[in-house]
Amino acid sequence: MAHTNKHYLDLPGSYFFTEINQRVNTYKKTHPEKSIIRLSIGDVTRPLVPAVIKALHDATDEMGQPSSFHGYGPEHGYEFLIGEIIANDYTSRNVHIEADEIFVSDGTKCDIANIQELFDPSDTVAIIDPVYPVYIDSNVMSGRLGKLINGIWSKLIYLPCTIENNFIPELPTQHPDIIYLCYPNNPTGTVLSKDQLTIWVNYAKKEGAIILFDAAYEAYITDPTIPHSIYEIDGAKEVAIEFRSFSKTAGFTGLRCAYTVIPKELKANTREGNEQYLNMMWNRRQTTKYNGCSYIVQKAAAAIYTPEGQKQIQESIQYYMKNALIIQNAITQMGITAVGGINAPYVWIKTPDNLSSWDFFDLLLQNAGVVGTPGVGFGPHGEGYFRLTGFGSYEDTNKAIERIQKALLI
């Protein structure tokens, strides 16, 4: 008889965002006359920009001709896209990255969940909290985090980000082997300065730890002093893997394209003390388990680096950031504490009157018809907080704010 992976049984009953959808659908069934505005799941709403659409059409036409048809592509990604990534995302910031250090994929979610396959199941994990749930769930599936006891994973090192520490995590007091950082941060919308990020790089060096750095929202940084890549920090190539995505940068949530950077000098040890290069290991993993992102999608991704593409995606980014700033300003004017919305499209709200995250969710759903994200879904230190996003339309964002103001009797 076949046996299941017992660690899957340790996962919570349903994926967090599924629970949100279930509550909303229940409300809609009992209140069919009510309109719902969603400022919850971080999906984009603006269409793909013209430069991307043209590239998709052109690449599709190529696939219809014998002379330009493409079958299986390179698992790393096509050179035409990798070259644009290097020139625009790294060389422009005085960071040297080589072509074989970039692995194009169909999504950061997949990569950041799969990367833990490279590490020993007994490695200790430190994760900022609150945080994107996939970091935790993927490690639960591998058995690294122990048991969930009163909302706390028994073997996980939590790095709290709360109002008390200005949402900047402190270095852990116990040794981690793997450290998850996400900046600009989802869900809090906060960032780390170069000095603050340097502290983490130096700490990882001292501890022999690996930083998994999720930079999916770097395109939303407006402060010129904030690093867009962890590799802007001296020595980071020795301790960090970086994850980037075109989903929020260029609206690719429905196309799926991303990339992961693993420097060739990045090493980890076996339990016997033998050094292994993680770039080689990930390459072996990808060539075994992955056939590459499609040619058509990679051509579309390359198009965002053209002058027209850059101009067009910046218009979309600025559109979303305008929405986020509207939310941030309105919430703070209500006398409610809120962070984010300046270097990220997320606004992180301290719930008023000490309401729980889910109670505040229900209040806004029932009284305003606005759907946000309960902070507790991002981890125990998200309890008492709530996330709203700038990814809606300008009209819906303003309408949602008006409804929230009325619901809170402001």
Swiss-Prot record:
Its cofactor is pyridoxal 5'-phosphate. One of its GO terms (biological process) is lysine biosynthetic process via diaminopimelate. Substrate binds at residues 15, 42, 109, 132, 186, 291, 387. Pyridoxal 5'-phosphate binds at residues 72, 108-109, 132, 186, 217, 245-247, 256, 291. The keyword Transferase applies. It is an enzyme of class 2 (transferase). Its EC number is 2.6.1.83. It catalyses: (2S,6S)-2,6-diaminopimelate + 2-oxoglutarate = (S)-2,3,4,5-tetrahydrodipicolinate + L-glutamate + H2O + H(+). It holds the Pfam family Aminotran_1_2. The keyword Ligase does not apply. Pathway: Amino-acid biosynthesis; L-lysine biosynthesis via DAP pathway; LL-2,6-diaminopimelate from (S)-tetrahydrodipicolinate (aminotransferase route): step 1/1. GO terms for molecular function: L,L-diaminopimelate aminotransferase activity; pyridoxal phosphate binding. Keywords: Aminotransferase, Pyridoxal phosphate, Transferase. Involved in the synthesis of meso-diaminopimelate (m-DAP or DL-DAP), required for both lysine and peptidoglycan biosynthesis. Catalyzes the direct conversion of tetrahydrodipicolinate to LL-diaminopimelate. NCBIfam families: DAPAT_plant. Homodimer. Belongs to the class-I pyridoxal-phosphate-dependent aminotransferase family. LL-diaminopimelate aminotransferase subfamily. This is LL-diaminopimelate aminotransferase. It comes from Lawsonia intracellularis (strain PHE/MN1-00). The gene is dapL.
